[in-house]
Amino acid sequence: KNGGSEVVFKAAPNTGGDRNTTVIFKTTDGKKEYTSQMAIAQKGAIVPLTVAEFNAKEVGDVQYRLTGLVTKVDDAAAGKYYISDYTGQVYVYKASGEVSLNDVVTIVGKHAEFKGTPQVGSGKLEEVCASAEPISLADFNAAADDNDKLYVLTGKIVEIVNDKYGNVYIEDENGEKVYLYGVYGDWTGENKKNFITDNGIAVGDEITVVTIKTSHNDAPQGKNAVCFGVKKAN
């Protein structure tokens, strides 16, 4: 405000990610032009998305939330590791918090790049949702039923019993099979229907899931399996 003049800048509510802009003001006294500028930063909502959606974003300051399975750890103490979900894999670079291989984690960070490859930058470990144990299909079938213990299974889909709820049989290279009663991609369990069909998952595809061991009519099975990896047959 100067000599009775006032400039008012109003920003609309930000329902997206963080955003920044620069407002340039120009005035004149009739002889000389004066310019000033003001940088404005507005925090936004943290945007939840899949790994594939994150990888497709541009480098910037928007904060994203991803949930994935830790598939490789370069340096746990330094927060350098890979996470994957059913859509793909991404590198997490120097995130706060410490993780272990086969943890299911939720990460918040920005889309950064290194030599053109997307990665999670300025990351923060929001939550270790669960820790799972990798196991062979044979050992899984022989394991005791336990609703509190999580396993990581990998196998090729050999039969889709129900594509609406994701009831499938998977098989390993030794011919061992496991029945999965329900496969979906949402760790929260809110979206359990049509995961198989919506994502074009078919017989012959290899999937990696995190699941508990249960039984039905004395037959072993995995239940409520969350998919953290898909390798297409073709």
Kindly give the residue locations of the regions a language model identified.
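Death-fold interaction domains
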Residues: 20, 35-37, 215
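Surface-exposed binding patches on compact interaction domains or structured appendages
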Residues: 1-8
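Generic structural detector for well-ordered beta-strands
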Residues: 8-10, 24, 39-41, 156
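Hydrophobic loop/turn residues within beta-sheet-rich immunoglobulin-like superfamily modules
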Residues: 12-14, 201
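OB-fold single-stranded nucleic acid-binding module
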Residues: 43-234
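A short beta-strand micro-motif common to beta-rich folds, especially ectodomain repeats
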Residues: 7, 17-30
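C-terminal edge beta-strand
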Residues: 32-44
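Beta-strand-rich extracellular modules
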Residues: 12, 24-30, 110-112, 212-214
